Curated annotation (Swiss-Prot):
Keywords recorded for this protein, A-Z: Chloroplast, Plastid, Repeat, TPR repeat
Pfam families associated with the record: TPR_8
GO cellular component: chloroplast
Organism: Gracilaria tenuistipitata var. liui (Red alga)
Family matches, as PROSITE patterns: TPR_REGION (PS50293)
Chain positions of TPR repeats: 87-120, 122-148
Membership in a protein family: Belongs to the ycf37 family.
Name this polypeptide is given: Uncharacterized protein ycf37
């Protein structure tokens, strides 16, 4: 009986250790990304992968305002010819607004993302979903037909 008790306690402690380790790795990665920010001529240079990682992290933690302001800042920093990156950022902003149930604003950002990258499937899917949510079934059907 005592051995069973020790096995159960060990399993629970292993689970707790795993969760703590995952949190520490996430915090370490976030600190490393923040330390890699280099100010260059009043602009902040940060790789697209890091920005999208931070976006996913903020969305996972439901820090919608942080995510939106960070992405808006980097949209203003991007050169005009980088439309794919801008489209991804607009898509993420639309997802944030959709998560806080501001559907009209989310639709606006999904449309901006669609104008920049009309061939991306996940952007089309998000746009169709927001059309459904808003009640614009006609446009939702058009987008769904494009998806298939």
């Amino acid at each position: 009986m005592f051995e069973l008790y020790l096995i159960i306690i060990t399993c629970l402690l292993l689970l707790v250790c795993y969760l703590i380790t995952n949190s520490l790795v996430s915090i370490y990665t976030q600190i490393r990304v923040i330390n890699n920010i280099e100010p260059i001529k009043d602009k902040i240079s940060l790789g697209n992968d890091y920005i999208l990682y931070m976006t996913r992290l903020y969305m996972k933690r439901k820090k919608w305002l942080y995510c939106i302001t960070m992405l808006e800042f980097y949209i203003n920093q991007i050169k005009i010819h980088e439309t794919e990156i801008t489209g991804e950022y607009y898509n993420c902003i639309g997802s944030c607004y959709q998560a806080i149930k501001m559907y009209k604003i989310a639709k606006k950002y999904y449309l901006k993302a669609y104008k920049r990258t009309p061939s991306r499937q996940h952007i089309l899917k998000n746009l169709a979903n927001i059309y459904n949510t808003v009640g614009d079934i006609k446009n939702a059907k058009k987008i769904y037909q494009r998806l298939t």
